[in-house]
């Protein structure tokens, strides 16, 4: 059965091929060839010419099919046919397995997707304790915490006697008691602990001391008084004559009315006279004004440990390195006042201190009567300029001489060294107690500071030996100046001889207006009530600009870092202060010309935060705060326009001791400026 299958297939193909051949290659025209396609070709039948008569025979009977020819070569593959119509046939049986292929290493495939997280494993065993880590850097100070609830007060056991507390505030001076008997000289007590108290109020001026003996006679020739001539005929106004010697003081007349405030330039300070005879040793003076607090230290605060038992006192150790500044602790309660000790012996005279802060300007005194004009003396020949001598000790003040002729402006002299401070005078009598002042306005609340933990008290060391007297401290903050009562006028002293002419001193403060002069002066010279001129320009123009508007301006620099807290900051290096309205010793600007002013300040911050305020007459006008970043140098500035009247005062001040990191040095300047914008 199987060998007949290929034979039947060949027979089927032969029949199909024969039917296709008969239909394709037999045409009705009798022309051999393929039929024309009705779409692409058009066949036109035509008759073939021949020499004979065309005879067309009848179609014969088709002969029997010939034998099957040999199978031809497979033709070229035709174009793909159109998709047929019909349902797909049944799936054939799987073929025989093919021969094994050649194995070769394939390329690595793409990474698969991440697997699902596995289940949580069991807890491992506890590991050993690791080594202690290094201490981390100090973090920034945290915000102040919420105050905790009030604790339950339980009376505790009485503790041991505490250390002597800080001295309390200075009380009011009591009434002068009767003089007691001198006590036995006691031993000198140890140096106490505590911050210096605030300077007390200024006492009333003491009684005027006795007049000292006149100084030695100065070297020089005094002209003889000429005889008064007879009055001649009044002629033309002549040149001013030499100023004659001052006559003897006349009897004191009745006090006149207070004159108007004069306009003038302060005269030059007179030359120091010959040293006088040293007087007797005076009484010990009152303690000086406390100096400003020192620069804040820097220290790292440790954790408070448990209080141990008190051990034996050890030897005093060597001074350690300066640590970082710790947080300020709370002030302790004032201790009980101790019993007064016996009066010790009088100590040796201390080193003269620096000049104190100038007091308030006193009232203008009464104008005395003018003395009679003296006779004109002969003018001596001018002497040669001598070498500059060393500054002598201050002598006794002689009588005020008559003003001389205006001299030419000399070259600026070399600034002399400040003289030693003279001995303090005797204590004056007790003044009349003043009235209690009205309560001032309540200040604005300050920035809350961070509260640090209180450390345990240290073991007290052995008392050290008495140290050498220290250098005089810097002047402290300005005290509250109270106006004292005018003391009685002392008797006039005998006139001393005229001393040598010294070098011109620094210009002094303006004095009270003098009485109107009676001397007749020619044109071109100073008259009573006339403004002095210098080089054709009024001296009052130093306070006026080019346009005639009044001028008041200053710019100053702070030379030392970390100024005192609670007092005006003394900017002591002057860039411009021609009108002298700013005082570099106190750091206060005093308004002399009422109007609108502009103030500005620029400060640097280092070590801790800074909180600086602009004050007007003791009241803060505005604040500037800068939070310090460790390792950096910050800046802060502020400015304001203010309306000032005469004698108003403006300054900069640090109101808080915990925010006092105001820094200034030789190359990093903190400055303060102000100027008049428009007068009123």
UniProtKB/Swiss-Prot annotation:
One of its GO terms (biological process) is endochondral ossification. Ca(2+) 2 binds at residue 634. Residues 137-147, 207-216, 506-516 have a biased composition (Pro residues). Residues 54-531 are annotated as: Disordered. Residues 19-56 are annotated as: Nonhelical region (NC2). Residues 410-419 have a biased composition (Gly residues). InterPro entries: C1q_dom (IPR001073), Collagen (IPR008160), Collagen/C1q_domain (IPR050392), Tumour_necrosis_fac-like_dom (IPR008983). Ca(2+) 1 binds at residues 626-627, 633-634. The keyword Metal-binding applies. It comes from the Eukaryota. Residues 520-680 are annotated as: Nonhelical region (NC1). Residues 57-519 are annotated as: Triple-helical region. Residues 1-18 form the signal peptide. Prolines at the third position of the tripeptide repeating unit (G-X-Y) are hydroxylated in some or all of the chains. GO terms for cellular component: cell cortex; collagen trimer; collagen type X trimer; collagen-containing extracellular matrix; extracellular matrix; extracellular region; receptor complex. It is found in: Secreted, Extracellular space, Extracellular matrix. Homotrimer. Type X collagen is a product of hypertrophic chondrocytes and has been localized to presumptive mineralization zones of hyaline cartilage. This is Collagen alpha-1(X) chain. The gene is Col10a1.
């Amino acid at each position: 059965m199987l060998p007949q299958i290929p034979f039947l297939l060949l027979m089927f193909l032969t029949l199909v091929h024969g039917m296709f051949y008969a239909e394709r290659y037999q045409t009705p025209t009798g022309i051999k060839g393929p039929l024309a396609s009705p779409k692409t070709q058009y066949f036109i039948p035509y008759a073939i010419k021949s020499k004979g008569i065309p005879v067309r025979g009848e179609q014969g009977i088709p002969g029997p099919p010939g034998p099957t020819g040999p199978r031809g070569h497979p033709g070229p593959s035709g174009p793909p046919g159109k998709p047929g119509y019909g349902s797909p046939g049944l799936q054939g049986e799987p073929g025989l397995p093919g021969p094994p292929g050649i194995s070769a290493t394939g390329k690595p495939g793409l990474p698969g997707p991440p697997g699902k997280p596995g289940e949580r494993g069991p807890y491992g065993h506890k590991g050993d304790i690791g080594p202690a880590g290094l201490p981390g850097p100090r973090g920034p100070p945290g915000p102040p915490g919420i105050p905790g609830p009030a604790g339950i007060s339980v009376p505790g056991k009485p503790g041991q006697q505490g250390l002597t507390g800080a001295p309390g505030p200075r009380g009011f001076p009591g009434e002068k008691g009767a003089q007691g008997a001198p006590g036995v000289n006691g031993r000198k007590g140890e140096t106490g602990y505590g911050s210096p108290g605030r300077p007390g109020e200024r006492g009333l001026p003491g009684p005027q001391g006795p007049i000292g003996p006149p100084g030695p006679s100065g070297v020089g020739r005094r002209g003889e008084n000429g005889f008064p001539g007879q009055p001649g005929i009044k002629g033309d106004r002549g040149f001013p004559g030499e100023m004659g010697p001052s006559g003897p003081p006349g009897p004191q007349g009745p006090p006149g009315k207070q004159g108007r405030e004069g306009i003038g330039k302060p005269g030059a300070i007179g030359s120091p006279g010959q040293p006088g005879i040293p007087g007797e040793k005076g009484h010990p003076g009152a303690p000086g004004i406390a100096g400003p607090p020192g620069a804040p230290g820097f220290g790292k605060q440790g954790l408070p440990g448990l209080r141990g038992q008190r051990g034996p006192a050890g030897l005093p150790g060597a001074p350690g390195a300066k640590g970082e500044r710790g947080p300020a602790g709370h002030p302790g309660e004032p201790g009980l006042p101790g019993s007064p000790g016996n009066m010790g012996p009088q100590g040796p005279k201390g080193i003269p201190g620096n000049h104190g802060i100038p007091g308030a300007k006193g009232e203008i005194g009464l104008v005395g009567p003018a003395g009679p004009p003296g006779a004109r003396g002969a003018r001596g020949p001018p002497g040669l300029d001598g070498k500059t001598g060393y500054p002598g000790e201050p002598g006794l003040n002689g009588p005020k001489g008559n003003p001389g002729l205006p001299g030419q402006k000399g070259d600026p002299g070399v600034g002399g060294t400040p003289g030693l401070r003279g001995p303090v005078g005797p204590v004056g009598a007790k003044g009349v107690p003043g009235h209690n002042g009205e309560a001032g306005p309540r200040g604005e609340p300050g920035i809350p500071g961070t509260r640090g933990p209180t450390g345990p008290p240290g073991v007290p060391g052995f008392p050290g030996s008495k140290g050498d007297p220290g250098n005089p401290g810097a002047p402290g903050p300005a005290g509250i100046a109270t106006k004292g009562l005018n003391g009685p006028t002392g008797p006039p002293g005998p006139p001393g001889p005229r001393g040598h002419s010294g070098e011109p001193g620094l210009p002094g403060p303006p004095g009270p207006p003098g009485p109107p002069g009676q001397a007749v002066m020619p044109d071109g010279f100073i008259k009573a009530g006339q403004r002095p001129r210098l080089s054709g320009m009024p001296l009052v123009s130093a306070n006026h600009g080019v346009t005639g508007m009044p001028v008041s301006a200053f710019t100053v620099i702070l030379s030392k870092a970390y100024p005192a807290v609670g007092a005006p900051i003394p900017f002591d290096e002057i860039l411009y202060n021609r009108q002298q309205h700013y005082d570099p010793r106190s750091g206060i600007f005093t308004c002399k010309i009422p109007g609108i002013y502009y103030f500005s300040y620029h400060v640097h911050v280092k070590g801790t935060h800074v909180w600086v305020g602009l004050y007007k007459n003791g009241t803060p006008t505005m604040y500037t705060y800068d939070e310090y970043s460790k390792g950096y140098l910050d800046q802060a500035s502020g400015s304001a326009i203010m309306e000032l009247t005469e004698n108003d005062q403006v300054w900069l001040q640090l109101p808080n001791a915990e925010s006092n990191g105001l820094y200034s040095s030789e190359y990093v300047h903190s400055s303060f400026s102000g100027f008049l914008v428009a007068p009123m």
